[in-house]
Amino acid sequence: GVIHGLRSFVPVMLAQGDECHIVNTASVAGLLSPPGMAIYTVSKHSVVTLTECLHQDLVTRTDLVRASVLCPAYVPTGIADSERNRPAELRNAPKALTPEDVAREEALRHAVNSGRITAENVADMVFEAVRDGRFYILTHPKIKAAIETRMQDILLERDPTDTFKPKAATKG
């Protein structure tokens, strides 16, 4: 998807000599490393890194073509229910879930479904970010704390923190 798009469009954008902007869509999972989502997360990290490299390559060649990476968090798009579209013969066998797995999935589903940011809001954010010249486009500012925690884990060479772990309910 993303690689083929870049191979098709970047040469045309460079040749036309007009201002252009590429926005690749990843996910906040491309900046974090949540458990239970390895395949999805790896693909999103790849999009982020590819776009970072693309940015570096473009700035050495031209001032006219730029790139940004969109990393949305909880936007109710129906992605959590995408398994329903997979043909029966290609579906994965159900896996046994631990109570922690169930809690994590419920918390994630709740966060997505209760998201106050619509796809239309995200589109507006993208146009604003392109106008402002921002590379990373984060739809949910509160997620920056989790990103900062991950960066600190790396810099301090410590085990990764599960920033997606559901918070324990408090009595009050």
Feature-to-residue mapping (PLM):
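Catalytic tyrosine of NAD(P)H-dependent dehydrogenase/reductases that use a Tyr as the general acid/base
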Residues: 3, 40
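Residue(s) in the substrate-gating loop at a strand-loop-helix junction
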Residues: 27
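Active-site loop immediately N-terminal to the catalytic Tyr-X3-Lys motif
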Residues: 34-39
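Active-site-adjacent segment of SDR/Rossmann-fold oxidoreductases
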Residues: 12, 16, 32, 53-65
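Active-site helix of classical SDR
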Residues: 6, 43
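SDR active-site lid
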Residues: 59-136
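Non-catalytic terminal and boundary segments that flank Rossmann-like NAD(P)-dependent oxidoreductase
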Residues: 154-172
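Rossmann-fold scaffold of SDR-type NAD(P)-dependent oxidoreductases
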Residues: 24
